[in-house]
UniProtKB/Swiss-Prot annotation:
It is found in: Secreted. It comes from the Eukaryota. Residues 21-83 form the LCN-type CS-alpha/beta domain. InterPro entries: LCN-type_CS_alpha_beta_dom (IPR044062), Scorpion_toxin-like (IPR003614), Scorpion_toxin-like_sf (IPR036574), Scorpion_toxinL (IPR018218), Scorpion_toxinL/defensin (IPR002061). Residues 84 form a propeptide. PROSITE patterns: LCN_CSAB. Disulfide bonds join 31-82, 35-55, 41-65, 45-67. This is Neurotoxin BmK-M11. It comes from Olivierus martensii (Manchurian scorpion). CDD domains: neurotoxins_LC_scorpion (cd23106).
């Protein structure tokens, strides 16, 4: 029985679990991508693996791109300063 549990756990680790999140996509220096149109944000987001994206007007960081179902390996805006 223990072998079955260990093998199941090993298979889970080997296959990996990929998750997604909705967030402001960020540049490497923790700065958002400012925007004016939904089309530009949708292209930026989908090019980075998200399902879609749009320009969030008047949000927390001004007019910035918000991505829906963005992969975990793509940087997002986190609390703290933008380091330009």
């Amino acid at each position: 029985m223990n072998y079955l549990v260990m093998i199941s756990f090993a298979l889970l680790l080997m296959t990996g679990v990929e998750s997604v999140r909705d967030a402001y996509i960020a540049k490497p220096e923790n700065c958002v991508y400012h925007c004016a149109t939904n089309e530009g944000c949708n292209k930026l987001c989908t090019d980075n693996g998200a399902e879609s994206g749009y320009c969030q007007w008047g949000g927390k960081y001004g007019n910035a791109c918000w991505c829906i179902k963005l992969p975990d390996d793509v940087p997002i805006r986190v609390p703290g300063k933008c380091h330009r």
